[in-house]
Amino acid sequence: ERKLQAQLFALEPYRSGRTPAVFVHGTASSPARWAEMLNELQNDARLRQRYQFWFFTYETGNPVLYSAMRLRESLETALATVDIGGQDPAVRELVLIGHSQGGLLVKLMAVDLETQLRADLLSVPLEELRMPEETRELIRRVVAVRALPFVRRVIFLSTPHRGSYVAGGWLAHQLARFVRLPGQVVRLTSDVLESDPLLKTRLESGLSSVHGMTPGSPLVTLLAPAPLAPGVTGHSIIAVTGDGPLEKETDGVVAYTSAHIDGVASEIVVHSGHSVQGDR
């Protein structure tokens, strides 16, 4: 079965002067899940004239940091392609919208964590590890978590900033065993097992996105408290299914206490299940 390739695409040709709004879907999903929201946005003439809508698709079973690398590099390539001379200020006002796991990818575009990631993952400097240069370069790319200078606004929908209790469940971890990782990641794992005991431990704790979104995982422990970079405005849309105290509510997949983060400009709580992007 052919693996889904990470890619960034637009529904229409690039239009100068319109700010890209990039939608990033969640686990076991696809860009098609944004259809209802997209229809609503396109029916608003004011929004339609101000924004152009792009979509990022990826294999959601891959490690979160690996998928974030693909998103980061896709955005950088796209902007360099559509605005070669740097003459369109609209592309430097990018809006990112992420649902569920997609929200984690979005946040990784708006925080500076490279130094902490290197310290947490590696017991010795990357340059001192004995491994093929190809593997070393892939690690550099994966941990290069720096706020992209053209991202100005991020919107989180039902995002498990502190992990999902569903991802931490027995069934999820059994299913994660069947995830087929990209060849790059498999080779990286093999090389690392022979070079760095600390990184070996991190890798053996689980490579798939399911493990990365487990409450208490190294990734969410580091990412949840990380502040958005200066100049980036954040918004949270959090779904709950009940009417009880928010700290006890969930959307069936993500608890309110996981979706809530400090430092955002606004937080809207709606009554919905986890697939809030398809509800009106």
Functional labels for PLM-detected ranges:
Residues 1-22, 30-36, 52-55, 82, ...:
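Flexible, membrane-associating and regulatory peripheral segments of lipid-active enzymes
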Residues 12, 16, 144-153, 206-220:
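Alpha-helix-centered segments that form part of catalytic cores
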Residues 14-16, 47, 88-90, 97-98, ...:
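Extracellular/periplasmic catalytic domains that process cell-envelope and extracellular macromolecules
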Residues 21-27, 56-207, 251:
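Serine-dependent carboxylesterase/thioesterase catalytic core
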Residues 45-61:
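Conserved alpha/beta-hydrolase
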Residues 171-280:
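C-terminal catalytic-base region of ester-bond hydrolases, centering on the histidine
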